[in-house]
Amino acid sequence: IALVGDAAHCIGESTKVIDAEGQLIAPGFLDGHIHIESSMMTPIEYAKAVIPHGTVGIYYDPHEVCNVLGLKGVDLMAEEAEKTPLKAMLTTPSCVPAVPGFEDSGAEITAADIASEMKHDYTVGLGEMMNFPGITSSAEPTHNIPGETLKAGKIITGHYSIPETGCGL
């Protein structure tokens, strides 16, 4: 809502006017962290399920799809998410596999891959950093991944500690 009252001076050729007199207006919900594929739905079906309940935007991290299909899977999800009415903001998976040597995956993400993915308009930042050993041991390949995100001027998301708890990641 930009203005309540007479807005005649703001109306132009491409302005969409919605007469909401007598109606209730509520803000939409923005989901700050979601893995669409965990719902066992495609982005289109996910949008159909959540929009009627007030979700209008999502920050999504398709790391499970990336574990299977690599960046091709991430890009396929992003292309489909753009076809929905949701404001879908991709956070590129940061850890594929989540912890190298701990699990098998169908792909591997490097800092060069992250640099490439950050060039997409639909990519707003980096998804959760799950490689706890790589971060705490200051492993250069692990640290280069968020570094590429910062070079691109984009955000880094994740599971962070609360200083008051004294806990780690």
Show which residues each predicted segment covers.
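Short acidic loop-to-helix transition motifs that present clustered carboxylates
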Residues: 161-166
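Short loop/edge segments at beta-strand edges and connector loops
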Residues: 5-6, 92, 160
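Di-metal (Zn2+ and/or Mg2+/Mn2+) metal-binding site signature of metallo-dependent hydrolases
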Residues: 23-46
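Loop-rich non-cytosolic ectodomains and luminal regions
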Residues: 14-16, 28, 110, 148, ...
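Divalent-metal coordination cores built from histidine and acidic residues
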Residues: 44-154
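Gly/Ser/Thr-rich helix-start
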Residues: 6, 23, 29, 55, ...
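Histidine-rich, glycine-flanked metal-binding segment
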Residues: 1-27
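Histidine-centered active-site/metal-ligand motif
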Residues: 33-35, 63, 159-160
